Amino acid sequence: MDVFAFNASLSMCKDVAGIAGNIFAFGLFVSPMPTFRRIMRNKSTEQFSGLPYIYALLNCLICLWYGTPFISHSNAMLMTVNSVGATFQLCYIILFIMHTDKKNKMKMLGLLFVVFAVVGVIVAGSLQIPDQLTRWYFVGFLSCGSLVSMFASPLFVINLVIRTKSVEFMPFYLSLSTFLMSASFLLYGLFNSDAFVYTPNGIGTILGIVQLALYCYYHRNSIEEETKEPLIVSYV
């Protein structure tokens, strides 16, 4: 009875962490909306790049496939979050293609085809693996690698913040959402004993803490600089 109660509690904690992760991830998925409102208003993609949305779609589709019962077990929350994420990214890509120039249209359509082709190869290839454990390792490593590279992308922004001593290019709520989502899925992976979930999200959690710490440090410094009286005051 004690073992049953423990397993039930573990399952409940996993579900709570997964639901929280889905909620925080939704905040990330809607974050590009102001950019696309501007694109639609100006009927131009200007200098914006569509590559982040292509890569995000690829990442969501790989992780979605990993979450299915064909690959792993008890990962329904991974399926929901990545289904929603893939839908958002696909909508962003379609809007980008509609409002960009002809050259970029062809480029984005080509990349979109590559994404679906790569995912198709991964799905078809993994289904050819008869052993469930080997299949889990194969797709798990791909999913883990994809997530790690996605979480590593803010390293450029972190370097920029340190170099410029400004948090202008690192929005607080985006960093907070990333940290909360990563921390939630870190717990989800731990409760589910899934190394391919808790490892990349553990890295994401650490990077999220670094971003928030840098934001607090440099934001406080910028406020102090603004409120500091100048040594020489001139009156005109």
Curated annotation (Swiss-Prot):
Q: What family classification does the UniProt entry report for this protein?
A: Belongs to the SWEET sugar transporter family.
Give compartment(s).
Cell membrane
Q: What induces it?
A: Slightly induced by the powdery mildew fungus G.cichoracearum and the pathogenic bacteria P.syringae pv. tomato.
Q: Which gene encodes it?
A: SWEET2
Name the record gives this protein: Bidirectional sugar transporter SWEET2
Supply the InterPro entries for this chain: SWEET, SWEET_rpt
Q: Which residues form the MtN3/slv domain?
A: 18-103, 138-221
Single GO term (MF) = sugar transmembrane transporter activity
Q: Which residues are glycosylated?
A: 7
Q: Which UniProt keywords apply?
A: Cell membrane, Glycoprotein, Membrane, Repeat, Sugar transport, Transmembrane, Transmembrane helix, Transport
Q: Which Pfam families match?
A: MtN3_slv (PF03083)
**Which stretches are Extracellular in the membrane topology?**
1-15, 72-76, 130-137, 192-194
Recorded topology in the membrane: Multi-pass membrane protein
> From which domain of life does this come?
Eukaryota
Q: What do we know about how this protein assembles, alone or with others? A: Forms heterooligomers with SWEET17.
Q: Which residues lie on this side of the membrane: Cytoplasmic?
A: 37-50, 98-108, 159-170, 216-236
Task of the protein: Mediates both low-affinity uptake and efflux of sugar across the plasma membrane.
